Structures are given as C-alpha cells and as structure tokens.
Amino acid sequence: VEEILPAEAYKLESLRRHLLDLYESWGYQLVITPLIEYLDSLLVGSSTDLDLHTFKITDQLSGRMMGIRADITPQAARIDAHCLNREGPVRLCYADNVLHTRPRGIMTSRVPIRIGAELYGYSGVECDIELVCIMHETLRAAEINDVHIVLGHVGIFRTLLLEANLDEGTERSLFEAVQRKEYDRIDEVLNS
C-alpha cells in the first residue's frame, strides 16, 4: 500500500478526468460502485480468483460477511442487469480504487486504480471494434507504448493453443496462468 504524492497525484487525476471525458464522448455513463458490500452480492457469479483477491470482514451490525471490492466490472454488470432496466446497448464506465489481498505480480500495488468502459446488451462485431478502439485511445492517452492485448474469448485462446502446438502440460499451465491473470507466469511458461 503506497501513498501518491502531489505531483504524481495530479498526473493521475488529470489522466482519470481525460479518460472519463473520452468515454463520455463515446456515450459511456459514469457509475460509482460501493467499496464494500455483502459477499453474497459482491461475489455472485464470479470466479474463484476474484474470491481469493477479495478482503473479507464481518459486518458489526448484522454479523454477515462483507467484502471490499477487488474488481469493479462485476458490480457494473450487476448495475446493468438489476438497476437500469434499459432496452438495447448500455454503456457504463468507472474509475476508482480496488483492494487485493495479494499483489497480482511483482512490483504491483495491492490498491490499484481501475478505470474501464463496459458495453452491455449488444454482442455484434461492432461492439468488439468499439471497445478495441476505446482501448487504443485509452492507451495512447496514457502514453503506454509497450502493449499486450488480452482478449478474453476462450475460442481465440484455444485457436492460438492449436497454432502453438504445445504439449498438454504446458497448455494446462498456460491456461491456469491466463485465468489468474498472472502475466509473469504466462511469460515464464511461454519462454520455457
């Protein structure tokens, strides 16, 4: 857990504002999700990985288990599914801190800032193109040049595995590392 001093805080806040304005220009609406929620709501339909990265505490009023969010995407999905009740595409964006029980890699923060844009209710190729374009503009605005694009479609992953012609053990190790988003481990498996 680290402090962000004035000069760096100013840069981060300027970038956050710029990116939220960018997302708004594409029609995305800002949502702010709770930092802490009851576990049954926070982790519904989520992966074991998210459960492992979620800090858990006992609510002193109700005695129920609560969690401090480790990801905002599931909360945004819940807002779309249960709160907005809209027809057609729904575009939501967010920017806030999350908290992880352990860092996701070497030299990474346990309290990272997450910013994102989510498009719900539309599954055409236009949706994919829109999100890749937004991602590209986001990376360019952040002056990030060394880019690795991670596409979360298992069909793409399986096709790449076939092309790579890896043995079964390596495929299994790679799949586990990808699911856990352990980027250092992915590099290690691919370079072995």
Spans of model-derived segments:
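Extended, charged alpha-beta segments that form solvent-exposed binding/catalytic grooves
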Residues: 1-192
